[in-house]
From Swiss-Prot:
Taxonomic classification: Bacteria, Pseudomonadati, Pseudomonadota, Gammaproteobacteria, Enterobacterales
Top EC class for this record: ligase
GO cellular component, one term: cytosol
Subunit structure: Homodimer.
InterPro entries named in the record: Aa-tRNA-synt_II (IPR004364), aa-tRNA-synth_II (IPR006195), aa-tRNA-synth_II/BPL/LPL (IPR045864), EpmA (IPR004525), Lys-tRNA-synth_II_C (IPR018149)
Name this protein carries in UniProt: Elongation factor P--(R)-beta-lysine ligase
Molecular-function annotations in GO: acid-ammonia (or amide) ligase activity; ATP binding; lysine-tRNA ligase activity; tRNA binding
BP GO annotations: lysyl-tRNA aminoacylation
Length: 325
């Protein structure tokens, strides 16, 4: 590509018109259901502790902060939205920019648009149904199918992910020609994620969206543990045509348990030589004050627009990708 061409948008103008229509349809969906649209900060003094997420960091120098105040671009609006929920705002949604300092490719740009929403009094299954309704309305696709994480592994890899040990997981990885990665990996959840990405994802959601629910409890993140089966978390993801679209939880409301999970993440980060991340004490205070029982989900809008257009890469639906920003 010549330098003179980089001033032009990444996406064709007709694609941007379709993008605007998708955004309008999303807003209509929530307005019709009485869900409040909110805006929360793009920067925070705290960030995520997840070992797989890498936030952008910046520094504010101004009145009262002559030595500088460390700030992080938000990887998701989740923490601020939960503070609004604890303050009594009721059901909310947000369309916003999120930022992740990681790979760039067909489905990734460091700056992207996220739809996130929270539903008080919804369990995981009721929110799954609402995500399905949204996808049908925006993409005009068939109703989704649902599989538990365990069912998906048993169907496509003939192994039980909830009981298999690391040796058994490595044996399955060998059948997928992944021994060069798996044989040196000591973290069981990383092995599971490798097998899910390479051995399960390619086979699901081909003709209609597929929800995968009840991830292992060790991958709960900010989700509650299932009261029926303590081996699994009330967490789900949805896939369609080779793309991960959304990640949702029946949200954890226990501040003490959430702090323990943040601290555990930071221990894992230390073991991998990654920097320790500041824990969001404002979120923990909101949980202490009382987060209502709720379920929430984050959905990648750019990826939905890709599917609506049949686009092959995220660059076809974003005005300016990072290499042209």
């Amino acid at each position: 590509m010549s330098e003179t061409a980089t001033w032009q948008p990444s996406a064709p103008i007709p694609n941007l018109l379709k993008r605007a229509a998708v955004m309008a349809e999303i807003r209509r969906f929530f307005t019709d259901r009485g869900v409040l649209e909110v805006e929360t900060p793009c920067m925070s003094q705290a960030t995520v502790t997840d070992i797989h997420l890498f936030p952008f960091e910046t520094r504010f120098v101004g009145p009262g902060h002559s030595q500088g105040l460390n700030l992080y671009l938000m990887t998701s609006p989740e923490y601020h939205m939960k503070r609004l929920l604890a303050a009594g705002c009721g059901p909310v949604f947000q369309l916003c920019r999120s930022f992740r300092n990681e790979e760039m490719g067909r489905h990734h740009n460091p700056e992207f648009t996220m739809l996130e929403w929270y539903r008080p009094c919804y369990d995981m299954y009721r929110l799954i149904n609402e995500v399905d309704d949204l996808l049908q309305q925006v993409l005009e696709c068939q109703p989704a199918e649902s599989l538990s994480y365990q069912q998906a592994f048993q169907r496509h890899l003939d192994i039980d992910p909830l009981s298999a040990d690391k040796t058994q997981l490595r044996e399955v990885a060998a059948k997928l020609d992944l021994s060069n990665i798996a044989d040196t990996e000591e973290d069981r959840d990383t092995l599971l994620q490798l097998l899910f990405t390479m051995g399960v994802e390619p086979h699901i959601g081909k003709d209609r969206p597929t929800f995968i629910y009840h991830f292992p409890a060790t991958q709960a993140s900010l989700a509650q543990i299932s009261p029926e089966d303590h081996r699994v978390a009330e967490r789900f993801e949805v896939y369609y045509k080779g793309i991960e679209l959304a990640n949702g939880f029946h949200e954890l409301t226990d501040a003490r348990e959430q702090r323990l999970r943040f601290e555990q993440d930071n221990r894992k980060r230390a073991a991998r030589g990654l920097p320790q991340q500041p824990i969001d004490n404002n979120l923990l205070a909101a949980l202490e004050a009382g987060l209502p029982d709720c379920s929430g989900v984050a959905l990648g809008v750019d990826r939905v627009v890709m599917l609506a257009l049949g686009a092959e890469s995220i660059g076809e639906v974003i005005a300016f990708t990072v290499d042209r920003a």
